[in-house]
Amino acid sequence: MTPARVWLVLAVIYVAFFSWYTSFGDPLTPEEVDGYVAELERVGQPPEAIEAIRGFMESDTGDDFVILNIVDSREPPLVVEGSPPAANAQEMVDRYMEFMYPALFARACHPVMVGSAAHRALDLMGIEVEDIDIWDQGVLMRYRSRRDLMDILSNPAFAGRHEFKVAAIEKTIAFPLDPWFQLGDPRLVLALLFLVIGFAWQALRRN
């Protein structure tokens, strides 16, 4: 294959990936917000959660964002309908994620960072809650857009699976970050990789 064709193939693949991975949509409209709120009410989301989510939707930028989650697992987890016998907290979360992972990956949403707690919280200010310094895990989850997140949360399949997450978690804090930036953005990494491949192919053809 000639270098020109190699560059063309790489360019087509990259443009396709960039177009899928990047949010080009406008911010959510008031009509969309009302529609998602109605869907959340229909699938049984708590009123206080819906109110918080409404505010998040109304401040939509149209861009991608991440949610920072810190989690303290419940051991043993609560027993709910459909839970595996003698399951631990991680097994309950895995059952919850059986729906979430396909829904996330199909929308270019994915974990950016996952880590286990190395110690209790080292710095707490303005917080006086018992055991607030005890956490098991931190997760940074990237979402392509708020519209994608709402499509997942308003899916009736999510409501049924959410019980497994509630059963497995003692306490959690989750808050969104937007704007945000990471040096390991897959669009940047893939662009650099394709440049290396393209120039390496050119060098091989010259030799």
Residue ranges and their predicted role:
Residues T2-W135, D178-N207:
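Short S/T/G/P-rich N-terminal loop/turn motif that feeds into the first structured element of a domain
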Residues V79-V80, S145-R161:
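Short amphipathic alpha-helices within nucleic acid-binding modules
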Residues P102, A106, D151, G160-E163, ...:
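Charged/polar, solvent-exposed surface patches and flexible loops
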Residues F105-C109, R144, S154-A157, E170:
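Sec-exported extracytoplasmic/periplasmic mature domains
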Residues E128, D133-R142, R146, M150:
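Acidic, glycine-rich flexible loop segments
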Residues G160-L188:
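Short, aromatic-rich amphipathic segments at membrane interfaces
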